[in-house]
A protein has these predicted regions:
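Gram-negative bacterial Sec-dependent N-terminal signal peptides
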Residues: 1-23
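Glycine-centric low-complexity repeats
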Residues: 7, 22-410, 419-424
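GD-rich hexapeptide-repeat beta-solenoids
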Residues: 27-28, 32-39, 203-212, 290-295, ...
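Small-residue (G/S/T/A) turn/hinge positions that recur once per unit in extracellular repeat modules
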Residues: 206, 210, 287-290, 296, ...
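Extracytoplasmic loops and strand-loop junctions of Gram-negative outer membrane beta-barrel proteins
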Residues: 267, 347-348, 356, 495, ...
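Surface-exposed loop/turn positions within long extracellular repeat scaffolds
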Residues: 382-385, 389, 394, 413-421, ...
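Outer-membrane translocation/initiation segment of Type V secreted surface proteins
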Residues: 482-487
């Protein structure tokens, strides 16, 4: 466990200069807020484009020449459609159709022959479409159809007068323009950092006594509104049917059909709101090999809110259909049909509200060899919206870091999908240590790094703390650690409760690790290493995992308040010290080489179990070594025992290899003797 050296400190709370220390005041340091994003621009040009040119009126039909009895007047000429309106303008109206030509006279001496019929009126021109890209006008109106020509005349009273010409059809109204889409708002800027601990700063120890906060991210710009679609042009009216004339009665012409109205333009889509800016970091550490003690509160900046969405433009109305053409009074002919109204355009789609900015990181460690002792509160920034990423409390990208959440220390994520501590790829050899009465709210993620370690620590005597093993593993609170250690002060205990199937190779270096079940130690593929610390069994425990003894001193060992049965091998250069009144049962062919000390309780060897590689076996008063259940007896080295100790043989043989000065003052006997 790393200890702080006595070096000059930098107190981040008040200005103080001396020969041995440098202090800097960053009390209540808050990073500057990020700039707000610009709102989207609405294309609101009010200039109107030139209207489309109105189509010219159709030529009147020529008068019929009385050269034959069945000559008809020529139809009126159809005009050209109105020209398309320019951008931002109004579509041109269609030209009116020309009137039908007058019917030719029946220039004949024969009675009963018909005079010529009047010519058909010309069709009205179609209205021009409006194709405005921003503030367009409606489509042009269709031209009216030309009237039908008069029926022809006859020089003979008994002849039949010519029929009036049909009226021309009205032109179709031009389509309205689609409204322009609103532009999206700009994203807000990232908030400023609260404090940067840079390589240029003097000192290698820093104490944070004043609160530090990252700046808030800028607000996203508002999206612009979409423009409304424009109205379609009205259809042209149908031409009036021509009248018959001369001495005899005959029918007039049919009325022309009204033109259909133009379709309305679609509304423009609203612009999306800009995204909010990311909150600034509270503290950025880019100076290698520094020690930081946090006594206050460090908070990441809040994310900026997303911009407001632009509203959709409304659909343009369709143009009205043109009226049908009239017929002469008293004529049995048909009035023209009214044109159909144009269809409404479609409404635009509302824009999307901008996403809020992610919350800022409270402490961002990019340097190597950083030790962070947290006795205050570390909290990630709040996101700018529900769907935005909350800020992490601590992010580590530098190697060889050691984060200690000390007594009273708190590390808080700021919401779902946020992490209390995130080790980024490459931040290898990271250590995360928690101590009694500390709080970690959120995931501690070491899945991206190698040789990571989770430590249950402490530096106060006779602490009694609890850790829940089921919090370890994929999808759990503590993820991706490759090593696990108990390294607290002597006399203090960490109680490991609950179960996990994760691979958790525990090492007990100092202090006591207490269990009620072997399942608390994780998969049996992970060995338990006693490196000077104590494993305590509170209840009876059976285990098939390997044990390693690495400490040459015998301050640690196994404390059996409940019987402990080990069926696998105990290895290593260290010794085994057994305390507690319950029994330690060994069934493996153990090959550890250190001393075996039975200070209290019983050591029971069974099956092929043996301790023949152990340097010595030492029994205290009231303890026993029992080999009665071994397969064929066993061997021990340098057996010693106090008066009142026992070796229980049963019907097995015990071979003792002892030095001349080894003294056994206890008793040998069969089981029960």
């Amino acid at each position: 466990m790393k200890k702080f050296k006595k070096k000059p400190y930098i107190f981040l709370s008040s200005i103080l200069l001396s020969q041995s220390a440098l202090s800097v005041d960053i009390n209540s340091s808050i990073g500057s807020a990020g700039s707000d994003g610009e709102s989207g621009k609405t294309n609101m040009s009010t200039s109107t484009g030139q209207a489309g040119t109105t189509g010219q009126r159709g030529s009147n039909g020529g008068r019929g020449q009385g050269t034959t009895v069945d000559t008809y007047g020529h139809p009126g000429g159809d005009p050209s459609s109105g020209q398309q309106g320019y951008a931002d303008g109004t579509g041109g109206n269609g030209g009116n159709g020309g009137n039908g030509g007058e019917g030719g006279g029946a220039n004949t001496p024969f009675t009963g022959r018909p005079a010529g019929n009047g010519g058909r009126g010309g069709n009205g021109g179609n209205g021009g479409d409006s194709t405005a890209s921003a503030l367009g006008g409606p489509g042009g109106n269709g031209g009216n159809g030309g009237d039908g020509g008069l029926g022809g005349w006859s020089t003979v009273a008994a002849s039949i007068a010519g029929r009036g010409g049909d009226g021309g059809n009205g032109g179709k109204g031009g389509n309205g323009a689609n409204g322009s889409d609103g532009t999206s708002g700009k994203d807000g800027a990232k908030g400023g950092n609260g404090f940067d601990l840079t390589p240029e700063m003097e000192g290698d120890s820093f104490i944070i006594q004043g609160s530090v906060s990252g700046g808030m991210g800028g607000y996203g710009g508002a999206g612009a509104n979409g423009l409304n679609g424009t109205k379609g042009g009205a259809g042209g009216n149908g031409g009036r049917g021509g009248e018959s004339r001369n001495y005899a009665e005959n029918s007039g012409g049919n009325g022309g059909n009204g033109g259909n109205g133009g379709n309305g333009g679609n509304g423009g889509n609203g612009g999306n709101g800009g995204n909010g800016g990311v909150g600034g970091d509270g503290i950025i550490v880019s100076k290698n090999n520094v020690q930081i003690t946090n006594l206050s509160t460090v908070v990441g900046g809040n994310g900026g809110s997303g911009g407001v969405a632009g509203s959709a433009g409304l659909a343009g109305a369709g143009g009205k259909g043109g009226n049908g053409g009239d017929v002469p009074i008293g004529s049995p002919t048909t009035r023209g049909k009214r044109g159909e109204d144009g269809a409404f355009g479609e409404n635009g789609i509302n824009g999307r509200v901008g996403n809020g900015g992610a919350g800022g990181t409270a402490i961002n460690i990019s340097a190597d060899g950083v030790i962070l002792l947290n006795q205050g509160k570390v909290l990630g920034g709040t996101p700018g919206s529900i769907n935005a990423q909350p800020g992490e409390a601590i992010v580590v990208s530098g190697k060889n870091s050691h984060i200690i959440n000390d007594i009273g220390g708190e590390i808080w994520s700021s919401g779902l999908n946020s992490k209390a501590v995130e080790y980024e790829a490459g931040a290898d050899n990271g250590i995360f240590e928690m101590r009694t009465n500390s709080i970690v709210d959120g995931v501690v993620d070491a899945t991206k790094i190698s040789n990571s370690k989770l430590v249950l620590g402490g530096n106060t005597a006779k602490e009694n703390s609890t850790f829940i093993a089921s919090k370890i593993g994929n999808g759990r609170q503590y993820q991706g650690f490759s090593n696990y250690e108990v390294n607290t002060s002597e006399g203090s205990t960490w109680n490991l409760i609950g179960e996990t199937t994760a691979l958790t190779p525990w090492t007990v270096t100092e202090g006591t690790l207490a269990i009620v079940s072997d399942h608390s130690l994780g998969s049996t593929d992970g060995a338990l290493t006693l490196n000077g610390g104590v494993l305590q069994t509170v209840l009876n425990v059976n285990s098939d995992r390997r044990f390693n003894l690495t400490a040459e001193s015998l301050n640690g060992g196994i404390l059996t308040d409940g019987d402990l049965t080990l069926t696998n091998v105990i290895s290593g250069v260290g010794g085994l010290k057994k305390t507690g009144n319950a029994t330690l049962i060994l069934g493996g062919q153990n090959d550890y080489t250190g001393r075996t000390i039975i200070s209290s309780g019983n050591l029971f060897l069974t099956g092929e179990g043996g301790i023949e590689h152990s340097e010595s076996v030492e029994l205290s008063k009231g303890t026993s070594l029992n080999i009665s259940s071994t397969t064929g007896g066993t061997m021990v080295n340098n057996l010693t025992g106090d008066e009142g100790s026992h070796v229980v043989l049963g019907d097995r043989f015990l071979t003792v290899n002892s030095l001349a000065d080894s003294v056994f003052s206890g008793e040998f006997g069969a089981e029960g003797e």
